[in-house]
Amino acid sequence: MPRHSKHSCSNSGKFSNYERQLLKYGTTTERLGKDSIKNFDSCSLCLNDVIMPVICNKGHLYCKECILTSLIDQKKLIKIKEKEWEQYQNKLKYEQDQKQEKQHQDSIKEFEKNVITLEGIGSNDDNNNNNNNNNNNNNNNNNNNNNNNNNNNNNNNNNNNTTTTTTTTTTTSDVNNKDKEKKEIVEKEIKLNSYWVITPDNKDKAIEKPRSYTVCPADGKHPLKSAQLINVHFTNVKPSSSDSNDSNNQYCCPICSKVLSNSTKTRLLKRCGHVFCSCLDKFKEDSSSQLSCYVCDKPYTEDEIIQIHSGGTGFSGSGSNLEAKKYTHTAIV
């Protein structure tokens, strides 16, 4: 749409740009604020403060009760979809068998029709030949001229028989072709739906084979089991801290005592479940020997560090998507 269509003078001055936005037709966009963004310490399912927090390998935080109920529901849904898929496969197999049987029966019927027509033609030829032979024997005793006449008659009879056989075969083939054309026309009429009437689809939708594993409900991409969940151990803010008056700031880093928020990149150790801020990287660089947790002294490797997923700070520089879109029908005004 060109830029001039947004002016108030477009479309005979009926609607201005502000009035069009009030209609809420077409694609509407809105900038998300800080209140619309999930906190790092809130559950990815219920969006409340976590109770008995657990985390997946990709850094999505959940309440233990929420994630377990979600995984159980996924297992139930998988069983239902597997039954539906099995029924659909049995239905396809049954339809395929029915088509093969029908084709086999049609081929048998066509073969029987051809055999019957050939038998009828052969019996008529035998009777005609016997009668002609008797007449020829009698006529041979009488006159040689009559023999010539009988031979001519036999030739005419044979020609008539061949014409009758060709006509019978052509008529049967024409009837079969007409029946096939009628069936095709009826099938097309069933498929054609009136565009102004709401009608259901004639064809059943194909059911794909369901997955046999549960996935993480936050993104739905990577598989997740209940045994893969990691218990999270946050460090509570001390009462002497200056930021303890804020109810949202509940947790801090055990190394630097910095209050954790969406602006701080929080990290978790996979073995013990303790949460740290970005100072864990500095602590990792300073230690030349084997890495160990600052709280419980458990050894860990760099691959066992998980970054906790957060919604962002509300600024565009955080890298998160801060624009929401809603698609509706366009208004012709």
UniProtKB/Swiss-Prot annotation:
> Region labeled Disordered — which residues?
120-181
Which Pfam families does the UniProt entry name for this protein? Rtf2 (PF04641), zf-NOSIP (PF15906)
- Cite the record's Low complexity compositional bias ranges: 127-175
User: What UniProt keywords are attached to this protein's entry?
Assistant: Coiled coil, Cytoplasm, Nucleus
> What are its GO cellular component terms?
cytoplasm; nucleus
The protein's induction, as recorded, is: Down-regulated by Pseudomonas aeruginosa, PAO1 strain and PA14 strain infection and by growth on bacteria.
Q: Which residues form a coiled coil?
A: 73-119
Kindly list the biological process annotations in GO that this record carries.
regulation of nitric oxide biosynthetic process
Its subcellular locations are: Cytoplasm; Nucleus
Instruction: Identify the main location.
Output: cytoplasm
Q: Name one GO molecular function term.
A: ubiquitin protein ligase activity
The UniProt similarity line reads: Belongs to the NOSIP family.
Function recorded in the entry: Regulates nitric oxide production.
Q: What is this protein called?
A: Nitric oxide synthase-interacting protein homolog
Q: Which organism is it from?
A: Dictyostelium discoideum
Q: What is the lineage of its organism?
A: Eukaryota, Amoebozoa, Evosea, Eumycetozoa, Dictyostelia
